[in-house]
Amino acid sequence: MPLRIILLGLPGAGKGTQADFIAKHLDIPKISTGDMLRAAVKAKTPLGLEVKKIMESGGLVSDEIMIALVKERVKLPDCHKGYLLDGFPRTLAQADALNAAAIKIDLVIEIDVPEEEIIERMTGRLIHPASGRTYHRRYNPPKVADKDDVTGEPLIQRADDREETVRHRLAVYRKQTSPLSDYYAQWEKSGDPQAPKYFRISGLGSMEEVRERILQVFEAYDPRDSGNLEH
């Protein structure tokens, strides 16, 4: 039975790592909107040519085009066992459009991490610019504070990892994407047979612990039942 999945969670919740694991574990493609746009442009499909024109003029690709691309992509043979949508939908309008286009979703997994933990994870990252070596103040600290272990040169914090930038990204997510949690939870509760199952799991702990919770979701998932698994 195919398994078509959406993964939700704040930036820094570990979605990328777990998305790679899910795709490999289930042998399904991870479909990211960025990859889809690039592939359509490269393939010079009618949609791709339209996307190229929009991107070259610095415009934003409309939800209508994104849905058409998703619809085209999930018809390809590698999606016969299912697929994982990565970074889509991001808004309620996109979720509604996905549903209206009859693009089937079986399972929505939300990785839940408190905002203060996200801020600590992201603002703690340090990088050695010349080599690309990365550290973390809490999880992987350098031997000498703020110095590269190999050269002793200063480590820097990327602009993206500064606290004000992280807080801004979280605020944007809260406004645009957080409502999707309620959208899918309420849809499931409505008893609509087309509704995907919604599971929320804790994203705290090690990568392996989060992975284990995802495996528990797959064990608990039954298309005939509704199930909200919270740890």
UniProtKB/Swiss-Prot annotation:
* Highest taxon of the lineage: Bacteria
| Segments of this protein annotated with the region LID | 124-161
What coarse category fits the chief subcellular location reported for this protein? cytoplasm
Q: What is its EC number?
A: 2.7.4.3
What segment(s) does the record annotate as region NMP? 32-61
Q: Which cysteines are joined by disulfide bonds?
A: none
Q: Which UniProt keywords apply?
A: ATP-binding, Cytoplasm, Kinase, Nucleotide biosynthesis, Nucleotide-binding, Transferase
Matching Pfam families: ADK, ADK_lid
Question: What general EC class does the enzyme of this chain belong to?
Answer: transferase
Q: Where does AMP bind?
A: 33, 38, 59-61, 87-90, 94, 158, 169
Known role: Catalyzes the reversible transfer of the terminal phosphate group between ATP and AMP. Plays an important role in cellular energy homeostasis and in adenine nucleotide metabolism.
Name of this chain's protein: Adenylate kinase
- Write down the species: Coxiella burnetii (strain RSA 493 / Nine Mile phase I)
Organism classification, top ranks?
A: Bacteria, Pseudomonadati, Pseudomonadota, Gammaproteobacteria, Legionellales
- The record's gene field reads adk
